[in-house]
């Protein structure tokens, strides 16, 4: 006897990488959208400008991702009407938390990241789980290839288990905020390597670079197969 099941979610792939640096934040996402072994489209953005020099990264179930980004944009517009000022990245993160937590019984199947610039001019990265728990981080990989990219970021950005030469394992290497070109090279290498190992990563990477001057967009080509 067969039993019908309700499964409203689809994994459409998508991987995002975020790095906070000295005077900038990078949020990048690959553009391949899949359903199993089928490619739906080769250009589906996973990073979205929502105004106020804020960028949202959303990957996972594409319908939920687009719905969440639309709700965030609506909330930012409402914030402008009520307060007549720009929304900060920290305020945006708190708002996204309430949106995700409010849907906790039927959550958005999305890996969400918020990127912006703080009051001191440093990059801000906030990463979320599907029900709203979040934290500020130096870097974060989310989505289908996160397991491949996270160890690379831990090594190159977080400097996990790395020590000052000659200290005999007693003095850890201090973390530092990266320069823009350093972060861009790490981002490019991360997606290039993931594309060689994961079938859901490919086609191109859409990169949003947030600075105090605004948001710059770059596209990095990836393999098409």
Curated annotation (Swiss-Prot):
Its main location: cytoplasm. It is found in: Cytoplasm; Nucleus. InterPro entries: Ntn_hydrolases_N (IPR029055), Proteasome_bsu_CS (IPR016050), Proteasome_sua/b (IPR001353), Proteasome_suB-type (IPR023333). SUPFAM superfamilies: N-terminal nucleophile aminohydrolases (Ntn hydrolases). Keywords: Cytoplasm, Nucleus, Proteasome. Transmembrane segments: none annotated. It comes from the Eukaryota. Pfam families: Proteasome (PF00227). GO terms for biological process: proteasome-mediated ubiquitin-dependent protein catabolic process; proteolysis involved in protein catabolic process. CDD domains: proteasome_beta_type_1 (cd03757). Gene3D superfamilies: Glutamine Phosphoribosylpyrophosphate, subunit 1, domain 1. GO terms for cellular component: cytoplasm; cytosol; nucleus; proteasome core complex; proteasome core complex, beta-subunit complex. Belongs to the peptidase T1B family. Non-catalytic component of the proteasome, a multicatalytic proteinase complex which is characterized by its ability to cleave peptides with Arg, Phe, Tyr, Leu, and Glu adjacent to the leaving group at neutral or slightly basic pH. The proteasome has an ATP-dependent proteolytic activity. The 26S proteasome consists of a 20S proteasome core and two 19S regulatory subunits. The 20S proteasome core is composed of 28 subunits that are arranged in four stacked rings, resulting in a barrel-shaped structure. The two end rings are each formed by seven alpha subunits, and the two central rings are each formed by seven beta subunits. The catalytic chamber with the active sites is on the inside of the barrel. This is Probable proteasome subunit beta type-6. It comes from Schizosaccharomyces pombe (strain 972 / ATCC 24843) (Fission yeast).
